[in-house]
């Protein structure tokens, strides 16, 4: 049984899904490198005892951190005693994770796949009427752009615009939309921007965590008679590199909690109800919050004209 694959593992976290196994550990010293290799050896022993095999040619190692000397000097070995190759990015369950933590490769892959799907739709259907093209967009393209978006997020204005331009270019092909500004297109089609949709989904996901409908990854909820239920947002270390702070700030563990706290109290306090009921109340509120930057159009710096619900 795969459920006991982590038996004897002391310093790492082991996860298995289908025929893939992942081993995660925080390593900051040479002793940590040795401990992680020992945990790998225990997993290899478990595989031998249970007549399981690992394909050493598919072993990949992704390393995060600023300690380049430790990263460059440490080596890990597979069950065949071959060195496990370090990769700048690794694809896991459809999400590409990069060593710099930016998810730029993931967004590049997502936008490429979404654009190919858009071109296929526009080549396959002669009509440019609103209803069929919007239906195709919602059914075939949106799932590509929003897959597992609670994990990855654009952490720079350029990446945000790269995603939005997929929707912008597609909506331009709809009859009567080519001469309209992007935000006017969204209003005419009664659609959200992709940034607003990601934020909406993250708020719903945080609510599911608080309602114990999905696993909790460390969110701490606080309730008071004056402020209602809200999430305690962890502080960012001022000693960390600016790029690290940006990535951390954009993550669900920080920005997701800020988004949830920005929702009105009566929505945050909703409990013991269905997900659809919460979605209905949230959508009713979001219709009152403008989904348009203070500077019209696709802007260069989102800080000057953000359409985030937190900044409204």
Q: Model-derived features: where do they sit?
A:
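Catalytic palm subdomain of template-directed nucleic-acid polymerases
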Residues: 10, 21-48, 154
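Basic, alpha-helical interaction scaffolds
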Residues: 10, 15, 81-151
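Short, conserved micro-motifs composed of acidic
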Residues: 38, 53-89
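Active-site palm subdomain of RNA-directed nucleic acid polymerases
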Residues: 1-24
